[in-house]
Amino acid sequence: MRLTVRLVDIAARGILLHHNDAKSLGVLAGDRIVISSPVTGKATVDYVETTGTLIDQGRIGVYHHTNEQLTLTENEVVEVRVADRPVSLDYIKKKMEGEKLTREDIRAIVADIVQDTLSPSEITAFVVSSYINQLDMDEIESLTRAMVETGDQLSFHAGPIVDKHSIGGVPGNKISLIVVPIIAASGLLIPKTSSRAITGAGGTADLMEVLAPVEFSASEVQEMTIKTGGVIVWGGATNIAPADDKIIIQEYPFKIDQIGQMIASVMAKKFAVGADVVAIDIPVGKYCKVHTIEEGKKLARQFIDLGERLNMRVECALTYGDAPVGRAIGPKLEIKEALSVLEGSDSPRSLIQKSCVIAGIALELAGKANRGEGANLALEILRSGKALKKFLDIIAVQGGTPDVSSEKITVGEHFYTVRADSTGYVIDLNNHSLITIARTAGAPADHGAGLYLHAKHGTSLSKGDPIFTIYADRKWRLEKAIEEARRLRPVMVEGMLIDRVPNVREWVPGRSRNLE
């Protein structure tokens, strides 16, 4: 069938057909068609949407994302035909039925995800089927390798190449801003690709973007790493393991965190950047992805097993996850706190200790320190000022201004301090609620938004003492965040007396006890 192009300014992928043309082709909404241009010779497969009013019969509406591949012009005539059904759908159905997928099955699924052959609903079917029928280690390895093969890779002549990762779930976990410069200052290479926040108040890429650009190609990442020893960039711009982002997008609405896919996601990125040694942070706590030490050890063994299959040395640290790391949550607040540590501040101790522990593991794995001595070496590098100098070098090589300090970072101009309404001790911090408040205040999109904790577990408070301060770039967002803070009450303060249980019976003076 020949149809005349009408370009539609919609960012999504897809094409729009009149009902009658769709009927003539024998397709329904959601089916695939092949569009080819006789002018350029380009062709692509995309999904059909139908209408009776938005497009005239004989015309085809081409969305922006689709036209990026075809470069069609308005009123150009194109050829349209029904596309073949992807064989990868059979493999997804196979997983739905509880069968084990082969390496070739998984390679076909991942290739179709990357090439946009599978629709979002079909990718969701793969995600859900892998969630219900868990991937085993063979499938996880196959998924990891397929993710790597379908994207760009880095290749360094010198080694060992170091990387680190945190599986997330803890607010304020800004340790990459300290770990990366410590590792790079030791003489090792660490090409750190990081994520943006999906449900959090700031991913590492969101934080680094306060100071420097974070979107680079894989070749640029490699070049900058060789020049300075390390980078902190957004992985989504590198085309490293591109299937991962497409899978994560489909996981998000269901709040699915499928363990096998998570392990493959992490390790694919590490393998693709050429990492020889990897330190993995697994926070453990009631508000974390991992709730118990036993669960954490099981997950760690899976990471280590996969590392051995991929010829990478992996070690995992089970870390305390029942409170934020440091006191700051939100891009500029966290950058300010990380810079203060790099500049020599002795607090917050949780941030310093965790950063040095993770950096220390990496230094030991890479042969820079004996076992058990890595954290001390990391602290020595931090205290010497070498890590700060290296961090400023990283900012510069990524196109930022290295003339920066913690004092120069300004946070949201609108703020409100939540205070204790009674005397007592902090007995609980709800990480989920703290993140919700920070996001309501505008983080991570508004870089100055977030919150700062004045009190953490065990802090003694008198009535009226500050518990945390909310910051926002916009007043209306601050007002919304205050409402959330009052509703959620994320910090629990209790005295030694939890409650009184009264005797509700009336007491009569002089009444004798019944001894019968």
From Swiss-Prot:
UniProt enzyme class: transferase
Active site: 257 (proton donor)
Xref: InterPro entries: AMP_phosphorylase (IPR017713), Glycosyl_Trfase_fam3 (IPR000312), Glycosyl_Trfase_fam3_N_dom (IPR017459), Glycosyl_Trfase_fam3_N_dom_sf (IPR036320), Nuc_phospho_transferase (IPR035902), PYNP-like_C_sf (IPR036566), PYNP_C (IPR013102), Pyrmidine_PPase_CS (IPR017872)
Catalytic activity as recorded in UniProt: AMP + phosphate = alpha-D-ribose 1,5-bisphosphate + adenine; CMP + phosphate = cytosine + alpha-D-ribose 1,5-bisphosphate; UMP + phosphate = alpha-D-ribose 1,5-bisphosphate + uracil
EC nos: 2.4.2.57
A molecular function (GO) term: AMP binding
One matching Pfam family: Glycos_transf_3
UniProtKB keywords: Glycosyltransferase, Transferase
UniProt: AMP binding residues: 169, 195-200, 204, 265, 289
Cysteines engaged in disulfide bonds, as pairs: none
Range of residues in the leader sequence: none
Gene Ontology biological process terms, A to Z: AMP catabolic process; pyrimidine deoxyribonucleoside metabolic process; pyrimidine nucleobase metabolic process
GO CC terms: cytosol
Family to which the UniProt record says this protein belongs: Belongs to the thymidine/pyrimidine-nucleoside phosphorylase family. Type 2 subfamily.
PANTHER family recorded: THYMIDINE PHOSPHORYLASE
Stored HAMAP family: AMP_phosphorylase (MF_02132)
Function: Catalyzes the conversion of AMP and phosphate to adenine and ribose 1,5-bisphosphate (R15P). Exhibits phosphorylase activity toward CMP and UMP in addition to AMP. Functions in an archaeal AMP degradation pathway, together with R15P isomerase and RubisCO.
Protein name: AMP phosphorylase
Annotated source species: Methanospirillum hungatei JF-1 (strain ATCC 27890 / DSM 864 / NBRC 100397 / JF-1)
